[in-house]
């Protein structure tokens, strides 16, 4: 399984850091301090201007994940959510020439986007259930907007359907090439794969169930300040998928947590303050949780340069097998 370019090792992050410095200069910030704060599907930097004290966030895109038109489409949805749905999202800071997506020259060139710095912190871990109720409510507002929004001409984002996640496209690599994939693991996860494919096909892609989603709407991508409305960040994975996938993504890496049933109930409670969720869809929640879990087995194998992937490693595959056995035998996995 081939790692994506930001996990390829060598001096790639040194070169990406230089790209970030160049992007800051092109934004009129020649003396800015540029600090790497996260690497995943892109590299995220904090940009501090020592002259004014202003702070912003710069995203340097990985290669081959999004064409420039898809990045522009993401930014269009952020703006629409903020202006039409009342969802707090970061504003884009255009370059002096008006460009919202800045292609920085280099070998190879990379697309970059500068965002305003939003105040707030991730909801505290000791109040996970409370955080999930807020998350459910803001997710519902985003889904309600997505169902009626008229996408602008040229709008393009990828899909998170079965083929894109686990099938012929396998955007993050194939789970069969994941870490710790012993014969026993292959056997149980292959059974899981087949069950997921069949159930998702039966669930269908009707307009009420499938549309534009954030696709990584974890608590880590919420910023809260006191009891006010949260801000939603990191839309880089947004695309077309099942709305319930946003709940599954919220449970990423913690699917085994003993409070997961309470987290799900809290998310549903928050969601239903905004819009309905039919019982027949609620019945498939664990199908989507396991769909996301199997996708993350593949993700860990291709993102070895990301801290959480290195930390979880083959143990995540083993835990996935345990959850899969419970799911396949009709027992709630948590």
Walk through the language-model features, giving the residues of each.
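Conserved NTP-binding catalytic cores of kinases and kinase-like/nucleotidyltransferase enzymes
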Residues: 1-97, 226, 333-334
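A glycine-centered beta->alpha junction motif in the catalytic cores
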Residues: 63, 98, 110-125, 170-180, ...
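Active-site acidic catalytic loop and adjacent metal/ATP-binding pocket
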Residues: 40-58, 92, 194-244
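Active-site activation/catalytic loop segments of kinase-like enzymes and analogous catalytic loops
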Residues: 244-276, 291-307
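All-alpha amphipathic helical-bundle segments outside canonical DNA-binding/catalytic cores
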Residues: 130, 277-289
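A cross-family kinase active-site recognition segment
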Residues: 123-187, 208-210
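ATP-binding pocket architecture of kinase catalytic cores
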Residues: 49-151
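ATP/Mg2+ or Mg2+-diphosphate-binding catalytic cores
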Residues: 2-7, 174-175, 295-334
